[in-house]
Swiss-Prot record:
Residues 4-139 form the ADF-H domain. PANTHER family: GLIA MATURATION FACTOR GAMMA, GLIAL FACTOR NATURATION FACTOR. The modification N-acetylserine is found at S2. GO terms for molecular function: actin binding; Arp2/3 complex binding; growth factor activity; kinase regulator activity. This is Glia maturation factor gamma. Pfam families: Cofilin_ADF. SMART domains: ADF. Expressed in rat thymus, testis, and spleen. Is present predominantly in proliferative and differentiative organs.
Length: 142
């Protein structure tokens, strides 16, 4: 991952928020939604949510603008074990402005690297974001 491909930097406050989120002790579903501040050329925090299901989360995402999401999900495995994977979701809806798409796509890898996440997914429509979709994606990481 070459730093020369970075389009936008990550806001230092967001870096700290991501660090705290990564080590949170709560056992509920939670999310951080991030956006690109075009004027500052920076990825910034847009909103935080506690006790939010995938279906509720998708209602918080714009249908025509990209967003980055870090989602802490209470995942109950088939054998009864419970884990709390941190998922990075890049919402990149069809029909976004090409300039926006490039800013987000060019900033994604750096943000994933800073957040230290390995479960990285992309959705092309907010309708894709639901519990079934998320469980299918997470099943790959067993």
């Amino acid at each position: 991952m070459s730093d020369s491909l970075v389009v936008c930097d990550v806001d230092p406050e967001l870096k700290e928020t991501l660090r705290k989120f990564r080590f949170r002790k709560e056992t509920n579903n939670a999310a951080i939604i991030m956006k690109v501040d075009k004027d500052r050329q920076m990825v910034v925090l847009e909103d935080e949510f506690q006790n939010v299901s995938p279906e509720e989360l998708k209602l918080e995402l714009p249908e025509r603008q990209p967003r980055f999401v870090v989602y802490s999900y209470k995942y109950v495995h088939d054998d009864g074990r419970v884990s709390y994977p941190l998922c990075f979701i890049f919402s990149s809806p069809v029909g976004c402005k090409p300039e926006q798409q490039m800013m987000y796509a060019g900033s994604k890898n750096r943000l994933v690297q800073i957040a230290e996440l390995t479960k990285v997914f992309e959705i092309r429509t907010t309708d894709d974001l639901n519990e079934t979709w998320l469980k299918e994606k997470l099943a790959f990481f067993r």
